[in-house]
């Protein structure tokens, strides 16, 4: 195997996940090729800007993992902005989850995880 193929990566799909993977490999000196059928078919055109693991119905360890991952995003976005000289537009603005009554609130999966 030649040096060129040893450090080459092919990624199928140019959505948010595919491009994120490509970015990380590229930062680590891999030659990256992304193949994408149609860019506007990716999930990024639907909800890529929504970072709300606490509103996804996750519980216990999966919720904690999601929250920890979400907390890494600002630093990651900053590295993308520095590498590209393009602002990504990340804004922390919260989320509103309305409830009809206190019982519904208490049944919400993240209600009992106030320390997260």
Task: Give residue spans per PLM region.
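Dinucleotide-binding Rossmann-like beta1-alpha1 core, especially the glycine-rich loop
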Residues: 50-116
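Beta1/beta-strand and adjacent pyrophosphate-binding region of the FAD-binding site
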Residues: 2-17, 33
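Flexible, glycine-rich phosphate/dinucleotide-binding loops
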Residues: 18, 41, 60
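Glycine-rich FAD pyrophosphate-binding loop
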Residues: 26-46
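Short secondary-structure boundary/capping segments
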Residues: 1, 40-43, 87-89
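Short beta-strand/turn micro-motifs composed of small residues
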Residues: 13, 36, 99
